[in-house]
UniProtKB/Swiss-Prot annotation:
HAMAP family: DapL_aminotrans_1. Belongs to the class-I pyridoxal-phosphate-dependent aminotransferase family. LL-diaminopimelate aminotransferase subfamily. Involved in the synthesis of meso-diaminopimelate (m-DAP or DL-DAP), required for both lysine and peptidoglycan biosynthesis. Catalyzes the direct conversion of tetrahydrodipicolinate to LL-diaminopimelate. Pathway: Amino-acid biosynthesis; L-lysine biosynthesis via DAP pathway; LL-2,6-diaminopimelate from (S)-tetrahydrodipicolinate (aminotransferase route): step 1/1. This is LL-diaminopimelate aminotransferase. Substrate binds at Y14, G41, K105, Y128, N174, N275, R368. It comes from Chlamydia caviae (strain ATCC VR-813 / DSM 19441 / 03DC25 / GPIC). Homodimer. Its cofactor is pyridoxal 5'-phosphate. Keywords: Aminotransferase, Pyridoxal phosphate, Transferase. The modification N6-(pyridoxal phosphate)lysine is found at K236. It is an enzyme of class 2 (transferase). It catalyses: (2S,6S)-2,6-diaminopimelate + 2-oxoglutarate = (S)-2,3,4,5-tetrahydrodipicolinate + L-glutamate + H2O + H(+).
Amino acid sequence: MQRNNNFSKLETSYLFSSIRQKIRAFREAHPDVSIIDLSIGDTTQPLHTAVMDTFTKSVQKLGNPETYRGYGPELGLSTLREKLSEVFYQGKVSPEEIFISDGAKMDIFRLLSLFGPGKTIAVQDPSYPVYIDTALLAGAKKVIKLPCRKETDFFPVIPQGEEIDIFCLCSPNNPTGTVLTKEQLEELITYANSHGSIILFDAAYSAFISDPSLPKSIFEIPEARSCAIEINSFSKSLGFSGVRLGWNVVPKDLRYSNGLPIIDDWKRFLHTTFNGASLPVQEAAITGASLFPNLEAIAHYRHNSSLLREALQKAEFSVYGGEHAPYLWVEVPKILPDEDFFDFFLTQYHIAITPGKGFGACGKGYVRFSSLGKIEDIMAACQRLTLTSVYDRMV
């Protein structure tokens, strides 16, 4: 059996797996040092009491012969799809256009696989590594990286003369923590509609947006229905990162170049490849959607971001993002070699972060801080950061 050649196109190891290995090695070499891990974007706040109550009752039903259920509907519980249409989209998206999944990461891969190999995929640079990896595994002909730099407020620069099949866009963005404005989204939507491209819009962090003028969904712009697919997740909004649940939206208006509706193929794809998300988790999400987002947890993470921003600025770092996202994109002084960023924060501050270059070439010169930690860890990190200026640490 020959190896799938697409694997040879990937980096040797996944970014966050490499970070975990480095942290583990440092802890083994320095057992007396307390490491604060602000590298991985995982949640730390518990599930809401009402969500937990529904979850528990639903699981208990599986232990009773009279209430036991096996497989659920592949496309998701109709009650949950209706609730999302009502609460999250205010009717702009119908329940029939919403599909419940086991998380955003799998949705990205499934949707790119739906369109088949040989496509040209554009991703933001810097960007979540999964977009590039899944595009390559799905057999993309070409992956184009769209530079997102501070000079353009991290808005992607679209290359001229390139025929792009699919744009992978994330807003609020991971890793920069910045948000696309309505005007910026309209520009991208106009481009996609005029060039026959599809926008794969990752809105997994939309619950963090507090400014009503900033779009939480690409479908707040009506013209997106003919060019966009949206992905979202309960991981950050309700703390479901450990139980896995998300959703995607494929509008009925979205069509192939031959006029056939994409939604029909998507249903066929899911019926073949997916048996549906966990029923107890979906039922818990129905309760959670009524609370959406879990404002107490979101407020906690926003407070963390505010504390980190203040501490980093006091230590003379330039900080971007973090106001409408759980990530802060931190520019590191140019006098420090790029490859030393991770080691610098680990050895000087005993804080683990994510080096920006792991998100792409345009991430060089930056690091990402996650505000999804516990408050005691955030406060301890802030104390370490503000002891001295970053420039004093480099002496």
